[in-house]
């Protein structure tokens, strides 16, 4: 009955927009994946230390017919990594928009159903509505902080393990220690995100039984605050990384206080 009502055609059209965004998902993911590929290429070159292999220049000249310039190659890889960061920052807002459009369609569908049942009266002068807006914004920033804390905790534990157990004077990495570091980071990140998921689902389900006006305002606030927070964090990460690349590649001031600040 709701979908057949012409008054609700705009909500259906919004759903079609969400469907169109989802259809662009493979293209967006392909563009977004360029960043990690370039980042890994630069990391592989740096960790391989090919330029320090005895006789490598003569071998490359003999096999491929050109004189290798490792410094120039490193510069190109760093520049490519910077371009990859820009690609990621450009593609992520599209994925964020997909989530927001889908969430908005769901929210307006809930609003229409509650209005049809006579349970909804949204007004900014009502205390439950104001409280819902405040709680939605608070949950977004709590989620952002808790997510970063989960990843940061794993990173600190990995650094502690490296300091205590790894011999940094070795020429080759120990595979067992490397696996342990990856396991530490993965376990802490997964444990942190699982706790966040349980808390978020519990809060949302509890709010759903509190008050219809409060719950709808809570959902609207999450969609609005979440949109701007997600775009801000997606662009901030790429900007910080590119600032570090600019100091390393263009200014050639790696190891200086300026470089330490950007790191």
What name fits each language-model region?
Residues 1-263:
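Hydrophobic packing and interface segments
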